Amino acid sequence: VANWEFFLTFVRANEAMDNINIITLTTDFGEQDYSVGALKGQLYSLIPKARIVDISHQVDRYSITEAAYLLQGAYRYFPEGTIHIMGVNNELSAERGLLLLVYEGQYFITADNGFIALFTHNKKGAEVYLLDLEDRRSIFPTLAFSTKIAQRLCQGTPVAALGTPYSEHLYISNFIPKVRAQRIEGSVIYIDHFGNVVSNITEALLREEAKGRRFNVYFRYQSVDNSSVEEICTQYNQKEDGLSAGDPFLVFNHLKYLEMAIDKANPKSFGGSASLMGIHVGDTVSIDFI
């Protein structure tokens, strides 16, 4: 029995170390330049057994809001011990250091740029550390610093040896809608591959504030009038009868955010919600209760 228990402990320990070699990348580097290749090459040189997963390299330039949304959608499907390198708006300075977020058993390496507050919504259980760096100067800090922090995590270095607990990280409230007596005011936080427009208004918030009331929804100038929570789709093929290709409808997407979609949207033909209606990230989304 003792030998069997030792074997199980050994297997579990090895599984944990395997998980800590999973490293994801979320950047705004695009695919044209050498940056992504250099970053992966550095990681494989430092961590030969690394398993690297691309979340996205097409994040809109400097948009930590978009990066936070994409990582929210992906991280929950990775095992504990996964390391996430966030390479958007990652420049460092004397005033802005490199941070390590420990959240739900996973590690997130990011500059102090507001990402942590956007990603965690200030939920309990988030541990933040200001990482100890001898020199913050680099024209490519994700390559110079984030990769080496990932290496030390994979080597089993305790988090406490990498930095000090930190609570003064930058707070940005882009994800938080404003709630008033007769209205919710939100904004567009993401436009997906199909041109569907994602707001920062969640199903839970809308249910809580609607209290059975009907409402009008406005994505910039486009409106969906006299709706209710129960009438909003939860699948893209669940749209109302009578809608044809090109018509807009409301849906709670996979992450339970309110989204305006276009039936059979294809940006290369008749377009998605964003192109047809001239909607951009940052535009206002409002819900007026009737």
List each language-model region with its residue ranges:
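N-terminal glycine-/serine-/threonine-rich phosphate-binding loop
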Residues: 17-95
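Active-site histidine-anchored catalytic micro-motif
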Residues: 22, 46-49, 66, 79-80, ...
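Fold-independent oxyanion-binding glycine-rich loops
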Residues: 27-29, 55, 87-90, 103-104, ...
